[in-house]
Every structure is written in C-alpha cells, then in structure tokens.
Amino acid sequence: MPLIIVSMYPGRTQQQKDEYAKAITKSAVEILKTKESHVIVVFEDNPKENWFLAGNQL
C-alpha cells in the first residue's frame, strides 16, 4: 500500500490538491501496478520559513 507524502508551501486550493492527488494516484497505479484503492496521498503544507537547503533558509 503506497503512502505518498507531498510536502509543499501553503496556498494551494482544495481543487488543486484534489487534481494533484488524482494524478499521483493514477501514476502510482500504472507504475507500481497497485490498486487505486490502495494508494494514500497526504498533503503537508509547510510554511516557507521551515524549508532549508544546505543549512540555509529558502
């Protein structure tokens, strides 16, 4: 059962998340040869100030 966690900046609409979750699920089904009902997608909205690259805030 794939659990796919998407971490991104806040600000996306629920419609955007719905569409993205459907696209991710479709890809997981095709690539991983699993059932749609087994794919879980979780969105984590994390403020930009929580993102760092090479020790530096983005």
Question: Across the structure, where does each feature detected by a protein language model lie?
Answer:
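A domain-level signal for the structural core that forms small-molecule/cofactor-binding pockets
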Residues: 2-58
